[in-house]
Design a protein with these regions (language model features):
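Long, structured ligand/cofactor-binding scaffold of large enzymes
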Residues: 64-198
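Mobile "lid/hinge" segments at catalytic clefts and subdomain interfaces of large enzymes
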Residues: 171-283, 291-293
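N-terminal amphipathic, basic-rich helices that act as targeting or association modules
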Residues: 28-98, 254-258
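Accessory "access/gating" subregions that flank catalytic or transport cores
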Residues: 149-158, 163, 268-416, 425-434
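Short internal beta-strands
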Residues: 101-110, 275-276, 420-428
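Flexible inter-domain linker/hinge segments
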Residues: 15-44, 311, 317-320
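Single conserved hydrophobic/aromatic residue that forms the stacking wall/gate
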Residues: 1-7, 11, 436-445
């Protein structure tokens, strides 16, 4: 980490000096690998990386190129945040890079085990990160109620640009806008201090849909069916692994799109990008504005007014879309993908269950989502120990569906009888607070 830190800081400082003095500089280190293919279009992630690239030759870059990019949103997780703060101190960094639009320090992982160690360490972490310029889940002076919301759910709410790059200290850092990557504490520290990150441009797998989702199905079933049909088509090979899933469901709003992108972490994908239509992206940005405003109303904005700045940027992005100045992100028609895959919605006619094969001879496959089954497989004989609705993929529409199901059972039988405990909880306060309801509905492609 130390060698990487020194190299990154040296490159950044020289680049800043050259930009300020408007002078060209000769390279000190060997140039990064650049792959540029003539007459080949760009995938969505290639477009984002080219737009945010720093210090390149100026050529159009394709997958496999190693690129230094500017980062828009950064998230620090509370269990690794102390290491991030130590690494920032090692850099002698005292304030967040002006390149970063917004950054958030979570408190979600330690909230569930608020033991004596957490009670000693987390307030100290929140104070450091607040002073550094981050929006913090817990206020160092206890001016607002602790925000124990799931980190990547919050990052999804504060991402306000479909061309953004997001770095987060959590494996589920997958957004419905832009492209997001989970990262270690050192990479998060570098992103906070320099506003940059370095990584190769990943290959992409294009996922499109045909047919119509049946009105009694849930979008989560489409998510599981995507994996089921993909594994079937590619003879059990997970073509998503280590790659970008570029998903084309242009009418999905932020919450449902996040259900898909968040799930891609379980399929070992590097990241995921949602391609949205104009109207859908505008509505998703308005949802983000509403949720950021809730955070402002709670008193979470800082002296730099980071949260208000995000709302201002969202308004600017909406104006760009409406005027046609900068349409929503789309890949080029002649972009090259590692694989292309079409999900058939017409054949999804019953709920799909992810059932990890914990007895698989291959240890690496015991706790993955490689085993997807239709609910009829269990013939009503599967024993349920616990029901839990409240993962990071859950949104308000899901909770409303559960409420309707329980009301229907009560109307039919006079009461609701549970054969196992059922836990229902919202992954974020914003899920409950925000008035916009995103009910899952059938969609046709």
């Amino acid at each position: 980490f130390e060698a990487r830190r020194q190299r990154q800081m040296c490159i950044r400082d020289r680049a800043f000096a050259a930009k300020t003095l408007k002078e060209k500089i000769s390279p000190v280190f060997a140039g990064s690998k650049e792959i540029s293919i003539k007459n080949q279009g760009l995938t969505a992630v290639e477009k984002i990386f080219n737009k945010n690239a720093v210090g390149t030759s100026g050529a159009t870059l394709h997958a496999g190129s190693y690129v230094r990019v500017e980062v828009n949103i950064v998230g620090s997780q509370d269990t690794t945040g102390l290491m991030t703060s130590q690494e920032l101190e090692m850099m002698a960094a005292t304030t967040i890079s002006p390149i970063v639009d917004g950054a958030y320090q979570s408190g979600c992982h330690t909230a569930s085990v608020w033991d004596s160690k957490s009670q000693r360490n987390i307030p100290r972490l929140m104070k450091f990160m607040s002073d550094f310029g981050l929006i913090t889940a817990r206020d160092p002076e206890n001016k607002y109620h602790p925000m124990t919301d799931v980190i990547h759910k919050v990052l999804n709410d504060i991402t306000i640009d479909d061309w953004a790059i997001i770095i987060g200290g959590d494996s589920h850092t997958r957004m419905s806008k832009g492209v997001a990557f989970g990262a270690d504490s050192g990479t998060v520290a570098l992103a906070l201090a320099t506003g940059e990150a370095s990584m190769p441009i990943p290959e992409s797998v294009k996922v499109t849909f045909k047919g119509k989702m049946k009105n009694y199905m849930d979008f989560r079933d489409v998510v599981h069916a995507t994996q089921y049909q993909m594994l079937k088509k590619f003879n059990g090979e997970n073509v998503f692994q280590g790659r970008i899933i570029e998903v084309h469901i242009g009418t999905l709003l932020a919450d449902q799109a996040f259900t898909f992108t968040d799930w891609t972490a379980e399929m070992k994908a590097k990241a995921s990008i949602c391609i949205s239509q104009d109207k859908t992206l505008i509505e998703s940005l308005n949802i983000a504005k509403g949720r950021i405003q809730i955070m402002i109303d709670k008193g979470m904005d800082n002296k730099s007014q980071v949260l208000q700045g995000l709302i201002d940027r969202a308004n600017k992005r909406i104006d760009q879309i409406i005027s046609g100045e900068k349409p929503p992100l789309t890949p080029d028609e002649n972009a090259k993908y590692h694989a292309e895959f079409v999900v058939d919605l017409d054949i999804i006619d019953e709920p799909m269950i992810a059932d990890p094969d914990v007895n698989n001879e291959d240890v690496s496959k015991r706790y993955t989502h490689d085993t997807i089954r239709e609910i009829s497989f269990y013939q009503g004989e599967k024993h349920i120990d616990l029901g839990f609705i409240g993962s990071c993929m859950v949104h308000k529409g899901d909770i409303k569906i559960v409420a309707r199901m329980l009301k229907n059972l009560e109307n039919q039988y006079g009461k609701v009888q549970f054969k196992a405990p059922l836990v229902i909880t919202a992954p974020t306060y914003n899920t409950v607070s925000y008035t916009h309801l995103t009910l899952p509905t059938s969609f046709e492609v």
